[in-house]
A protein has these predicted regions:
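Fungal secretory targeting signals
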Residues: 1-24
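N-terminal/edge-of-domain interface segments
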Residues: 21-220
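Intrinsically disordered, low-complexity segments enriched in polar/charged residues with Gly/Pro
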Residues: 8, 118-120, 171, 264, ...
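Amphipathic alpha-helical interaction segments
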Residues: 17-19, 49, 158-159, 165, ...
Length: 785
């Protein structure tokens, strides 16, 4: 279990200094946690006893107070080890703060970080605004606080606290609700006196709610938290990964050879230490220690931090070690995480290809919609701004229905080797191919579940197998993933599970009934359908299993996971993969948020770091994943934008999944291919600043055009706007640069002079860089040995 701090002030008896390492034991191995009482500022009630009892979001919707049965006034975060007052008050009165610019005094001290529990009260809307830290010297620091939705449907966001129900105004709902932990770095050399919350008071746009706030005090170098995961070491699935969080409040730096980190416990031994070569005052890193445990057991662990001559120890009582098989229980599935290869890969190619490429219509800006939704929009004109219904009538006439497009989905020029070679040339590390979209047409062998696939209609080829085989043969470094639609719009076997996304004529939905020709009213065929008893048991889950076991997908990229059999599928797949030594991952859209490894924002990016892994997808088309013939060449994403988005997302712990929509014949729009190749030249030259990097704890960016990434050996400054040759560039963020470090322009082998001043770190951009480079310019700070 996690050490719980029940006093407002509780401090550790010993710390580890980078400059003077001594052999000591710190009870609990934790920093000091100050849990800030918020009672005076509470102005909203989030937890109700019955539908309509509490008004969390202005619509008399709320969390369910019964879901708090296991909480006794304190929550300890497994991710950070931080303790919070939660719930914040007696639950018959206010229990959270709607941010209205409140100024909250805190006990004056030199804090390392400020931690929040937050949520957005707007369904599926991520809110971000600035919180202001006020210091005793009358200076301030503004930093972003981002709140993800308290609940969402289909595209879900996994919270740090997950509750099974939601109260609507008049009824209960069994979609999960969430609260999220946010960590913000504070300059530990300054005395913090107050925290000023942002002002977010518009219920239409959504409001940020704060449920708890805690402050961390660190003295010197401290192991702040350990987290035994169920992740396994690549190449040896008997080895468990333990995540160690180490923070340095200074004043000394971790320099030179740095420190090694290992872990000892009864029945547990370290087989691979972690290394930290550089850690500046105010900085924090999460590193992995690989261990082998004799069995699953709760034991007291000692973490040792070692320099070349001295050691310091930190003790963590009653932590569970050992690898376990997954079960269908949600508390088991939530332990699964994205593997290291995915976290380090950063960049993948998404491919949407199916019969929807035949009409290939989504109109153009500002009337564009997803072209792969053509069938849906022709039957739901109230939801459509693209004029799909009118386009279909004037182009194909009233008697052509969607399944008639199968014969024109020819793949006549489809060359899987050309595809995977393009993915490699683009610099991508993985790809995700749409195995089946919402139209129910699959491009793989669906066996007995349906005949509605590319082996029987259209290309008469196993498209997925051909692409996967080409990748294995010609580009074996590419990881292989599959998009899979959980429901099918017009499959009548889905009828008993049919749903709408919300009430009203403009709702998107999966009715599970046969479509009717929107021009003639006649019932449309569902070509290839075979008799089954249950959609989930006989089609959905078996198709996922085919992808998992026959095609050996490494990424199960679900979409629209409402009704599902995911718990059984996940537990079996996770266990099978572990037994075979395969590192696989699954996204947040399979219907069970607890089992998700990474979030999936769509056509947007986060504006600050998310410590929980995420991947943003969007098309090279302005607003379509499938091929859209209405898009002019000039509107497709260019190489500069590809690089800028990849750099931005990488700096914030995200991956970039960039989509292309091939034509019905299998060719890729030429302007897309050109941009991918051009971006790939830059990506491959600057690979060390992108792949295998991590985010920086203190800041992801400075201003609009500067981003940061790091490895254990170097720190990278990425400029999305070209610096002026012969002039100084000043970075105000507290960069981890020290005397003796070598700064170079990456790929140019040009050394850059630097100096430290009151305003920050100044770099003299070399005159010889005039006219050199494109898209993004990178400085590398190589750490001195």
């Amino acid at each position: 279990m996690y050490l719980r701090l029940y006093n407002l002030y509780l401090w550790t008896s010993a710390v580890l200094s980078a400059a003077t390492l001594t052999t000591t034991s710190t009870p609990g191995g934790k920093d000091t946690v100050v849990r800030v009482p918020l009672t005076k500022y509470l102005n909203n009630r989030a937890f109700g006893a019955f539908p309509g009892d509490a008004n969390f979001n202005g619509a008399f919707e709320s969390y369910n107070v019964a879901d708090l049965a296991g909480y006794t006034g304190t929550f300890s975060s497994p991710q950070t080890g931080t303790d919070y007052n939660f719930p914040a008050s007696n639950l018959t009165i206010y229990d959270n703060i709607v941010c209205e610019g409140q100024l909250i005094p805190v006990p004056p001290d030199q804090y390392f970080s400020v931690q929040f529990l937050v949520a957005s009260d707007s369904r599926e809307t991520i809110l971000a605004n600035n919180v202001t830290f006020r210091f005793a010297d009358n200076t301030t620091l503004e930093t972003e606080i981002r709140a993800e939705p308290w609940w969402a449907f289909l595209t879900m966001y996994k919270g740090d606290l997950i509750f099974p129900t939601r109260f609507m105004q008049n009824k209960s709902d069994y979609n999960t609700t969430h609260i999220f932990e946010v960590t913000k770095a504070v300059n530990p050399a300054k005395t913090l006196t107050a925290v000023e919350l942002p002002s977010t008071t518009n219920t239409t746009d959504g409001r940020i709610h704060v449920f708890a706030m805690s402050l961390n005090i660190v003295s010197g170098l401290v192991v702040q938290n350990i987290r035994p995961t169920q992740k396994r070491m690549d190449g040896d699935t008997s080895v468990q990964i333990v995540e160690i969080t180490i923070g340095n409040a200074g004043p000394a730096w971790v320099l030179g050879a740095g420190v090694s980190i290992s872990l000892e416990a009864p029945g547990v031994k370290t087989v691979k230490e972690a290394k930290v070569k550089r850690l500046a005052p105010g900085d924090q890193k999460r590193v992995d220690v690989a261990v082998v445990a004799d069995s699953v057991s709760n034991v007291t662990a000692t973490v040792k931090v070692m320099s070349t001559s001295e050691t310091s120890s930190f003790t963590f009582p009653e932590y569970e070690f050992g690898l376990k098989n997954y079960t269908e229980d949600l508390s088991s599935l939530t332990l699964h995480e994205s593997p290291d290869w995915f976290n380090k890969a950063k960049y993948g190619i998404f491919i949407h290809w199916g019969p929807y490429a035949v009409p290939g219509w989504g109109n153009s800006t500002p009337y564009e919609v997803y072209a792969e939704w053509y069938w849906f929009y022709t039957h739901h004109p109230a939801t459509d701004k693209s004029g799909s219904l009118e386009y279909g009538l004037r182009t194909f006439g009233p008697d052509v229905v969607y399944d008639d497009f199968f014969q024109n989905f020819t793949a006549s020029k489809f060359d899987p080797k050309e595809w995977v070679d393009l993915f490699d040339a683009a610099g991508a590390q993985y790809f995700v191919l749409t195995s089946k979209h919402h139209d129910g047409f699959a491009i793989f062998d669906t066996e007995k579940t349906t005949n509605r696939n590319s082996l029987n209609y259209g290309p008469k080829r196993d498209v997925l197998k051909e692409v996967f085989d080409a990748a294995k043969k010609y580009q074996p470094h590419l990881h292989r993933g599959t998009y899979f639609s959980m429901p099918e719009w017009y499959n009548p076997d889905f009828g008993k599970y049919g749903f709408a996304t919300h009430e009203g004529a403009d709702s998107l939905g999966w009715p599970g009934i046969l479509a009717r020709n929107p021009y003639t009213g006649e019932e449309e065929p569902y070509t290839g359908r075979v008799p089954i008893d249950d959609y989930i048991e006989d089609l959905q889950v078996p198709q996922q299993e085919i992808l998992a076991y026959k095609y050996e997908t490494e990424i199960m990229w679900c979409d629209c996971g409402a009704a599902n059999g995911s718990a059984g599928f996940m537990s079996k797949w996770f266990n099978e993969a572990n037994a075979l030594g395969r590192q696989i991952t699954i996204n947040s859209r399979c219907g069970i948020v607890e089992g998700s490894d990474f979030g999936t924002p769509e056509y947007l990016t986060f504006s600050s770091v998310s410590t929980r892994k995420w991947e943003s997808s969007q098309g090279m088309d302005p607003y379509s994943y499938g091929y859209n013939r209405a898009t002019p060449d000039s509107d497709y994403m260019n190489a500069s934008t590809v690089v800028a988005k990849l750099v931005d997302m990488t700096s914030k712990n995200g991956n970039f999944l960039l989509d292309i929509g091939p034509k019905a014949d299998g060719t890729i729009v030429d302007v897309e291919a050109q941009a991918l190749r051009a971006a790939g030249v830059w990506i491959k030259k600057h690979a060390e600043a992108i792949f295998n990097t991590t985010y920086w704890f203190i800041e992801a960016e400075e201003g609009e055009h500067i981003r940061f990434t790091q490895t254990n050996d170097a720190f990278y400054i990425l400029f999305l706007e070209e610096p002026v040759a012969g002039q100084d560039v000043v970075i105000h963020a507290p960069l981890p640069i020290y005397d003796g470090d070598i700064v170079t322009v990456l790929t140019e082998d040009i050394e850059v002079k630097w100096s430290r001043g009151d305003g920050g770190i100044s770099f003299s951009w070399p005159k010889e860089m005039a006219g050199k480079g494109e898209y993004c310019w990178v400085l590398k700070i190589g750490y001195a040995a």
